[in-house]
Amino acid sequence: MNEYLLDANVLVRFLVQDDAKQSAAATALFEKADRREIALHLDGLAVAEAVYVLIGRYGLARSDVANVLLAIVQNAGVETAEAGMVADALQRFAAANVDFADAWLAARAAVIGHPVASFDRDFDKFKDIRRFEPKT
C-alpha cells in the first residue's frame, strides 16, 4: 500500500474546492484513503498551516475551520501524528480567542503537565494548564 504525508495545500484544496483540477485530485486522494487503498499521514504542522490559510486567505470562521479539520483528524483513513493533541488544540482554538500556535502549546502543556513560560495572557483562558511569566 502506498503511503503519503499530507501537505496543507492538499487539505485546503479538498476543503474549499476552489481549483477544479487540484480539488478533484485532493478529493480522489481522500476517497482512496477512505477505501483503504492508500494511507494518508497528517502532521500537526500541516494542520497549523491549513488553519492559517483557511482563516487568513479564505476568511472562514475559526469554529468552521476547527470543525472541518477535526473531522479530517478523526477520519479513519487518515493517520494523524499525535491525533489526540491535535484534536485538543483544534477544540481549544475553536473555543477560545487564541491563535492556533497558542492552542497547540496549551494542548501540549496539558499532556506533559508543565506550565507554559509566556508573557501572553491568552494562556490564562485555559483552566487546565498554568502559565509561568518570566521575571528578572
Language model features with spans:
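Short, well-structured N-terminal submotif of metal-dependent ribonuclease cores
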Residues: M1-L42, R57-N67, K135-T136
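Acidic, PIN/NYN-like endoribonuclease modules and their adjacent C-terminal/linker elements
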Residues: E3, N75, A106-T136
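Short, conserved alpha-helical segments within structured domains
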Residues: L42-A46, E82-M85
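Amphipathic alpha-helical segments within well-ordered protein domains
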Residues: V51-I55, L70-V73, L90
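Active-site neighborhoods of divalent-metal-dependent phosphate/nucleic-acid chemistry enzymes
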Residues: A76-A117
